[in-house]
A protein has these predicted regions:
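Flexible, low-hydrophobicity surface segments
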Residues: 1-154, 169-172, 257
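Short Pro/Gly-enriched beta-strand edge/turn motifs at strand-loop
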Residues: 80-82, 165-179, 264-271, 438-449
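Alpha-helical support elements that line or immediately flank enzyme active sites
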Residues: 46-74, 108-128, 189-258, 315-325, ...
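Accessory "access/gating" subregions that flank catalytic or transport cores
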Residues: 175-180, 382-465
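Beta-strand segments within the central parallel beta-sheet cores of soluble alpha/beta enzyme folds
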Residues: 76, 225-231, 259-269, 296-301, ...
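Short, surface-exposed loop/turn segments at secondary-structure boundaries that line and modulate
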Residues: 74-105, 147, 210, 228-249, ...
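Phosphate/diphosphate-binding loops
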Residues: 106, 112-114, 256-308
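Glycine-rich loop/linker segments at domain edges
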Residues: 14, 20-23, 27, 154-189, ...
Length: 478
């Protein structure tokens, strides 16, 4: 909360500083690990699997329990409620009970007097595995028909006739890798037992309500017994939407078993091993187009590496499907989406939430058409834009009317103001005389859906308090 001076001047076009900017730049902003710890606070660490696929034959934790400072060791058998932290499907165990599905999966957890003691103790576990051959790539998953969710197919228009009658056809493949969120503040939760059989969670999360729900399920408690506080995060970008739940659940389970406050903060190496990333995608496509470069038909198969569980892969892939058109009209299109299950960490939300992976492939297709025809890539993009006025070329492949389409006029204005044509010509001249060092220039439009595909998510609430001294307090969700 911050106090801002009252102003009667215009606000549109005026920079408004972030309410915590002065705290950030001065180093006074308090994150979870900066908060004073209550007396008796224990520190947690997780024991991680060292195989990618298999089963636990024997888990010997005697040396872990005997390590100085260790107060509690937690296994899947000790979870009183539901052993699940999956946001949609119940396929994401908090602690693996038998089956190992990726390298770095949690197989037990420890609470100790100090963080160093907890981290040292988890290394003493003696684990015997019955290892199996893992599926580590999308190609291997496709060959084995290994899916976290069933494949999805969509078609609009007469695709085969469009290809049969097209003067030009191309085919190609592409791959875009995953990405680590690399938030500056790692996954961290601090759980404090309170009176009357309740818990207070201080958690670095993008989804406090889901933390409340999943922690209550793991404990077998009611939601009103769990309160969750998130003052600020040191970065999230989607990596703390569903992925923070596992660590909140572990800290809560240990806090209840010990009756002590418990904090878990992952080291960067464990954070990168055990938490999900952006979905990597690979594509195979065929395009049909005319002499002007206008797309007449598109056949596309795209596969995503979802990891070992569904997590948010369903809505991520759905959003990818809804963005394969970007700003362009696709008259005849046949699409197949494969949601690959691999023995890797379960991938999750990341900025754009599947949208960038969809836009990437259509931009790649248009670039190939431009190279084939010897045309400027921007010209090919402009030819394929949705029409400005609603009509036959203004409907997306999934049946939505594109309205208020400013992309054609905006791109034309930007190209003129930045002197695009002259700069492209100068770059071509430079590249012709430079065999090693090359220059480039691109202008790429973006059409991005700002709402959820599930309509009921597109709502929010706010509470406004107007006080007698004229000040205002606004509380809002999200």
């Amino acid at each position: 909360m911050s106090a801002r001076p009252f102003s009667t001047g215009p606000l549109v076009g005026r920079a408004i500083p972030h309410e915590s900017a002065h705290l950030h730049v001065s180093g006074k902003a308090a994150y979870v690990d900066d908060l004073p710890e209550l007396a008796g606070t224990l520190h947690a660490a997780a024991g991680l699997s060292t195989v990618a696929h298999g089963r636990i034959k024997n888990l010997d934790l005697a040396a872990v329990r005997a390590y100085p400072g260790v107060r509690c060791v937690l296994t899947a058998a000790d979870i009183p409620g539901e052993n699940n932290c999956g946001p949609i499907l119940h396929d994401d165990p908090i602690i693996a009970s038998d089956a190992i599905q990726f390298y770095g999966q949690v197989i037990f957890a420890v609470a100790a007097d100090t963080r160093d003691a907890a981290r040292q103790a988890v290394r003493l576990a003696k684990v015997e595995y019955d290892a199996e051959t893992p599926i580590l790539s999308m190609d291997a998953a496709i060959a084995a028909e290994s899916w976290v969710l069933p494949p999805f197919a969509m078609q609009r228009g007469p695709v085969d006739p469009a290809f049969a009658n097209a003067p030009h056809r191309l085919s190609g493949t592409a791959h875009v890798g995953g990405q680590e969120h690399f938030y500056l503040e790692g996954q961290v939760s601090y759980v404090q037992p309170k009176e009357d059989h309740t818990l207070h969670l201080i958690c670095s999360t993008q989804h406090p309500t889901e933390m409340q729900q999943l922690v209550s399920h793991a404990l077998g408690w009611r939601s009103h017994q769990i309160s969750v506080e998130t003052r600020r995060m040191g970065g999230g970008f989607g990596g703390k939407e569903s992925q923070s739940a596992q660590w909140a659940c572990l800290a809560a389970l240990l806090a209840v078993r010990t009756g002590k406050p418990v904090k878990i903060r992952l080291d960067r190496d464990d954070d990168m091993i055990a938490t999900g990333k952006r979905h990597g995608f690979q594509y195979q496509w065929q395009s049909a187009f005319d002499d002007a470069g206008r797309l007449l038909g598109l056949k596309l198969e795209m596969a995503s590496n979802c990891g070992y569980s569904a997590d948010l892969s369903g809505p991520v892939n759905d959003r990818t499907i809804c963005h394969i058109d970007n700003a362009y009209y696709l008259d005849a299109v046949a699409l197949k989406s494969l949601r690959c299950k691999t023995n890797t960490v379960s991938n999750t939300a990341f900025r754009g939430f599947g949208g960038p992976q969809g836009m990437f492939v259509i931009e790649t297709v248009l670039d190939d058409i431009a190279r084939h025809l010897g045309r400027d890539p921007l010209e090919i993009r402009q030819i394929n834009f949705y029409d400005v006025e609603p009509g036959a070329r203004s409907t997306t492949p999934y049946g939505m009317l594109v309205e208020d389409n400013v992309a054609p006029a905006l791109v034309a204005e930007l190209a003129a103001e930045c002197d695009y044509a002259a700069r492209r010509a100068a770059i071509a001249e430079f590249n012709a005389g430079s065999p090693i060092i090359k220059r480039g220039l691109a202008l790429t439009p973006v059409k991005f859906g700002i709402s959820f595909n599930a309509t009921h998510y597109n709502q929010a609430g706010a509470l406004v308090h107007v006080y007698t001294d004229g000040t205002v307090l606004v509380s809002h969700g999200g």
